[in-house]
Amino acid sequence: MSLGELLETCRSRRIELWSEAGRLRYRAPQGALDAGLAERLRAEREALLEHLEGGPGWRAEPDLAHQRFPLTPVQAAYVLGRQAAFDYGGNACQLYAEYDWPADTDPARLEAAWNAMVERHPMLRAVIEDNAWQRVLPEVPWQRLTVHACAGLDEAAFQAHLERVRERLDHACAALDQWPVLRPELSIGRDDCVLHCSVDFTLVDYASLQLLLGEWRRRYLDPQWTAEPLEATFRDYVGVEQRRRQSPAWQRDRDWWLARLDALPGRPDLPLRAQPDTRSTRFRHFHARLDEAAWQALGARAGEHGLSAAGVALAAFAETIGRWSQAPAFCLNLTVLNRPPLHPQLAQVLGDFTALSLLAVDSRHGDSFVERARRIGEQMFDDLDHPTFSGVDLLRELARRRGRGADLMPVVFTSGIGSVQRLLGDGEAPRAPRYMISQTPQVWLDCQVTDQFGGLEIGWDVRLGLFPEGQAEAMFDDFVGLLRRLAQSPRAWTDGDATEPVEAPPQALPGSARSIAAGFAERALLTPDATVIHDAAGSYSYRQVAQHASALRRVLEAHGAGRGRRVAVMLPKSAAQLVAVIGILQAGAAYVPVDIRQPPLRRQAILASPEVVAWVCLESDVPNAGCACVAIDRLAADSAWPPPPAAEVAADDLAYVIYTSGSTGTPKGVMLSHAAVSNTLLDINQRYGVDANDRVLGLAELSFDLSVYDFFGATAAGAQVVLPDPARGSDPSHWAELLERHAITLWNSVPAQGQMLIDYLESEPQRHLPGPRCVLWSGDWIPVSLPTRWWRRWPDSALFSLGGATEAAIWSIEQPIRPQHTELASIPYGRALRGQSVEVLDARGRRCPPGVRGEIHIGGVGLALGYAGDPQRTAERFVRHPDGRRLYRTGDLGRYLADGSIEFLGREDDQVKIRGHRIELAELDAALCAHPQVNLAATVVLGETHERSLASFVTLHAPAEAGEDPRTALDTVRQRAAQALRRDWGSEEGIAAAVAALDRACLASLAAWLAGSGLFASATPLDFATLCQRLGIAEARQRLLRHWLRQLEEGGYLRAEGEGWLGCAERPAQSPEDAWTAFAGCAPAALWPAELVAYLRDSAQSLGEQLAGRISPAALMFPQGSARIAEAMYSQGLHAQALHEAMAEAIAAIVERQPQRRWRLLELGAGTAAASRAVIARLAPLVQRGTEVDYLFTDVSSYFLAAARERFADQPWVRFGRFDMNGDLLDQGVAPHSVDILLSSGALNNALDTPALLAGLRELLSADAWLVIQELTREHNEISVSQSLMMENPRDLRDERRQLFVHTGQWLEWLAAQGGDLACGVVPPGSALDLLGYDVLLARCKTDRARLEPAELLAFVEARVPRYMLPAQLRVLERLPVTGNGKIDRKALTGFARQPQADLRHGVAQAPADELESALLALWREVLDNPSLGVEQDFFGAGGDSLLIAQLIARLRERLESARRHPFDRLLRWALSQPTPRGLAERLRSAPEEGRGPALAAARGVAPAQTGMSRAPLAEGAVALDPLVRLVPGEGVPRVLVHEGLGTLLPYRPLLRALGEGRPLLGLAVHDSDAYLAIPAEYLNACLGRRYAEALHGAGLREVDLLGYCSGGLVALETAKSLLQRGVRVRQLDIVSSYRIPYRVDDERLLLFSFAATLGLDTAALGFPAPERLGQAVQAALAQTPERLGAEALAGLPGLADLVALRGRVLQAASGSADAASVERDTLYRLFCHSVRASQAEALEPYVGALRLFVPDAGNPLVPRYAEALETQWRAAALGACGIHEVPGGHFDCLGEALAQSLSKPMPEEASQ
């Protein structure tokens, strides 16, 4: 007996132990301490003393009885769990129970008894303060008992009353800071009396409740009974527990638990709904009972096996959870009654003594229930021997090590077996409740068992909204059924798993026990001259193939081929492959296909098998094989007919060996027998009616088992096989040609190849081809969009999904694909083929329950013989089931659906846990593919164990419809850029002369340096090697020397003769000094500043010293680190300024075309920021007006990056990063498909291979991207004698042509070749800039691609999967990589994902920006006990957890005045969403108390003093629930006002008083502008509706009225839909003048007018025409382009031409001054524009309820026939009744008293249903 068991025995016998002065003391009831136990106590005396003295002793502190004391860890968890900010939170830890009392119960007497207990028990007077402390009130008033007098009700009415009380109390969440917390009620009927107890377990636990009920009954029955005063208190107990945490025992227990921590499993992986409701707060109670006889029988059987009855109940629960858990190892959360014998009276004290203990369970261990129960019991007692380090402590450590979410252990076991009755002793025992339900925060399932009422009471409380329909009931029934079996049957304890009845083993199809080639042979004899196969060379009959195969057979037999031998085949895709395999099989041997593209070492590994006696290949491919090689193309066909019969083989003989990739890196050879494969071939031919009329396209390689069907299944049926040309085997256009040429009827491929064909055909919409009648897809996931796309092309094709494994005869399972399957997350896997079995089994070989994931096992006649030469691997994968069947473990995961079919869930590798959540990658891929622009999606897992994350990749469709002509936009941008080039350049002749003088000066310096070689003095040519030797030219500079020689030759200094050079006799005689003086004299200073001229001269005159290394080229250009020369070269010249301004204007023109779009710019080689300055300055006003720009400034040099960070520090939208254009472009932190504008000034020429660079950059470009490039476009001798000495040698055509630069034409050719759909130069030919040799190049790329922002796609996916499933990386690719077999290459994707996404921000840890950040940082460091944290440190990343963040919030509210203005729960939500000091500071700053301008003040509140960016108007005493605002208190069904386009409740001000009389009035307002704007407009209303419904549901509302005005009506509609899905009744949905705009608004003038009108500004004073005139202009423009109001549609109206000035007037008027409240004003305008864009989304989806539409009688001047338009839209949206009501006023002023009166009239009851 362990020490823990000894203590438990003493507790069970009510023996109290304590230490006193080093001696062991005890107190025991008579007869409880027998001789054996006394001896045991003496033997364990020292251990007991050590245990009892390990913690601090009892310390009574009566003087502090009414002072605050801390919560226990469990209490703190309960309090924190009440916050709805946490998943599975938002509810109390509460029990509601109903007890029968006598019908004649005296309420006054019962009330007196209750108050007597309140006086005796301090915790009945306790409250919780500040969510962190508890306090016992010294005095409380007399507590009145709520009594419902129902004696006048009949039985039915009384039961209805009880139901109403139950509905009100069974999920009550009592206010813990207000006494009384416990408020029992009494219902007295005619014949019944029911006591209602809603008990918050934060103050008293279940055992305390039983003590309370027992004492209450005793006091009621005997009012004179006097209980002994309680000296012990719960407060004193908590003090002991607090001090215990400083004891050696706590440290010892902590060490024990932490040593086990990394090995602890996570929570049970129970199947959940596709979208579990993490905000659900409702529970359902299940109850069952073992009668006393059954319970005694179970206890007796437990005793026979040395187990306790309580331990058996726990083991049975673990067994049940293990049956349903998709991971066999998991932790259960045990609640433990922690009442140590610290004080004799502690057993009578009320309080929450609950402790938690995590019990690790592995359901795989143990061959019988007894063994597993013993193991669990031993583990539990070991755990309970280390109790001082609590389960809450352990959960916090789990969260620290594994991340947020790991601390969720939501499956709880609570046992009161024996313990409750022992605690009650001989006192009054309460009766069993007539009804009971409990709920606990962050708990999914709570199992409670107790024997206190005789028999065993079994209860489960299950959170609703998590588990699939019927699952909780099935799990509960399993648990109860197991307990009943254990009580009834001895075999249930000792037998292994009881297997379910097994159907008769699958039987092979008749006629399948033969060679796989027998069907071909029969067909050859039957129709010898029928065509059997087509390849690139021609067509062949059965006779031809058979005769060639016969010839091959003879040769192979001569080399020893026969039964038991193998012959390898390495041939390209052709008819020769069919000849080879038929010949090999006729010889009785097995064939081994080897892909001709495989690496030599892999081929050698296959060849190493001693059974391989020969190879068949082409003469040109004969390998050095070490065995006989037969060149099939040198064999002549046999002429004999019929050919000799095939060698006799047994059905179980080997037919072929296919090698697949092995997990160890060594290929594994799968050996299939003839009988196994023949059964599949026969089933497929019969199933799909394959006959001689069919043509199958043989896409599969011979080494892929789909080819087995093509060659042996199709040919046996007489069908023809069509093979693609091996040179075009992966070309879908070639497949299309074959479909047309051969009228293919049977398509057999992996899904990716079907996808490739459809992708190609969709790009050729005019091409019409005959389609296959039957399509077989297998080998990989089938994208759910593929069937629909296929049917769109060929609606008559029958589509089938086939599955299985190479180890099981090609296929084992089939699913006909139906249209409804395309709406699922994945195509179902289906049912087994004939002769085979496919089962989903758990780790113990049991059939998984429906919905539970397990491993797919294949059985039946199709199983392989095993793996060639690998008995160990064969034994691992081919296993014996307990019932004796042989099964193949596929490693694939699946689950049974309700109809018994199987759903495929991917490989085990496709399952991952992220922060404790089980994720199926297929579900995420399906959600991504559901987006209409996504073509394919694939997700991979990154990282190990607790650091795992997801990376998703998608490819996109082409745009659904063509936009504007790309040439038009390109020409517009070019014209804007060209205008920026206009300058007073002076005389073009003078510029040309200066350029020529500069060239002469450079050449003169070169010639003078070259003279040192003796070249000009030599009479014979000097070869290149001699020149290099004489001049001392290193190899790295020899290319530059060749360039110089060419330039000197063109300049008349020398001429080439043969392999050498000679000086020209009549070469220019000008000296370098004279030449440079001449240039300086004619060079315009505006183009060549004096400092630049001096630098060029100095560099040209010191070539020898630079080449010798005596002078550094870099030091010349950057003297003493100064950039002044670089500034003179790149920035100061007139040409540099013009070029950079042209680039800036071009980029501005591009951005201004779509100012609402987010623009991502990447500048390469930014260097001195010469171009950057112009571009950033030009973009800054656009950013200020609301355009979102992300500008990434890059260079290879940290020198330039540091300077740029300082220069642009005031532009937060500019980021910085290192980028090496000559490195791997995908390895530098810029994601593919993420750049909208790529700009570069003079840098791309520095690339080693410019065409390759442009090709790589294309991968980074998004759809419809732009290149804006400035480059040198002629040879510049001044560069060749200066900067070229710092440049590397190019490897493109510049090297071949001895050039440093290329002309504009070559640049345009490169751009066109590398994805520039359209490209042009800006500089006019013959202009000054052209003479100087410069151009600005524009290219527009990927105009044929759809555009999709990853953020937009993430928002789309967020509506379909839980947040924990969202990928950490999301990248858009041109195409997904595929393997040789056409499957998605996930290994390659993992490599892509591991390419770094560099942190390209400012990079330096920043100090606190103000006092608020400093204060928050101090709190972060204090709570986390880490002084090194920074302002951007994530709280949870630094080791924080949910309990610590609650402490942080409590301290925050204590210390910061700005935080005390906000309720605890709001601060907690903010901290969870922005868990950094800087992020939380920003949230606090963005909720100011006062506004800044009159218009904005009105927008944000009822009066200017109540404004704030993140808060809607608050009436006096109103409470903000973020985004929910309580405006007016009241009783009854609340009315909820939904904000309009400003995100505010401004328009409702006239209605507040009228609507708020007598009933609650709530509002929904935008609380986080950034979050609102981050939601893509097309999903905004639906996303808001979902979030607002969550807020209303989380606030406990179950019935509401909704009111939405303007765009708020659209949001209200979506909110109503989501509320209905959550079970909340929408009694009235009222829509006021809400209009979905049926066209796109591109003219900002209309937005500005609507914004001003909504704010109530004087639109005429702002310069707008009359609204009617504006409306007429809108309609006139729409008559021309109905789908779009063009960007300049209203520009011709008076006063509206200057959009910039108009915008300035409106925004100034909105803020009340030119600069006040500009940030708030601009944000408000952005909110409004975003809301308008959301109102332009697709047509309204139907709403299944009724609604009322209120139409202003004066209409909307911007919309003709407004009433009719509104009625049409909303009648179509409402499937229920749609009442139309006219109200006075126009759209902008209809919210008045008349509307309030109309709204007050209730909707007819029949319409509201």
From Swiss-Prot:
Residues 1407-1488 form the Carrier domain. GO terms for cellular component: cytoplasm. It holds the Pfam family TubC_N. It comes from the Bacteria. Keywords: Ligase, Phosphopantetheine, Phosphoprotein. One of its GO terms (molecular function) is phosphopantetheine binding. Residues 69-490 are annotated as: Condensation/cyclization. The modification O-(pantetheine 4'-phosphoryl)serine is found at residue 1442. Residues 1584-1797 are annotated as: Thioesterase. GO terms for biological process: amino acid activation for nonribosomal peptide biosynthetic process; toxin biosynthetic process. It catalyses: holo-[peptidyl-carrier protein] + L-cysteine + ATP = L-cysteinyl-[peptidyl-carrier protein] + AMP + diphosphate. Its EC number is 6.2.1.69. Its cofactor is pantetheine 4'-phosphate. Residues 520-915 are annotated as: Adenylation. It is an enzyme of class 6 (ligase). Pathway: Siderophore biosynthesis. Belongs to the NRP synthetase family. PANTHER family: NONRIBOSOMAL PEPTIDE SYNTHETASE, PYOCHELIN SYNTHASE PCHF. Involved in the biosynthesis of the siderophore pyochelin. Adenylates L-cysteine and loads it onto its peptidyl carrier domain via a thioester linkage to the phosphopanthetheine moiety. Then forms a peptide bond between the salicyl-thiazolinyl intermediate bound to the second carrier domain of PchE and the cysteine bound to its own peptidyl carrier domain to form the salicyl-thiazolinyl-cysteinyl-S-PCP2 intermediate. It subsequently cyclizes the C-terminal cysteine to form the second thiazoline heterocycle in the salicyl-thiazolinyl-thiazolinyl-S-PCP2 intermediate. Modular protein that contains a condensation/cyclization domain involved in the cyclization of the cysteine, an adenylation domain which activates the cysteine residue into an aminoacyl-AMP ester, a peptidyl carrier protein (PCP2) domain which bears a phosphopantetheinyl arm to attach the activated cysteine and a thioesterase domain (TE) that may release the newly synthesized peptide from the enzyme. This is Pyochelin synthetase PchF. It comes from Pseudomonas aeruginosa (strain UCBPP-PA14).
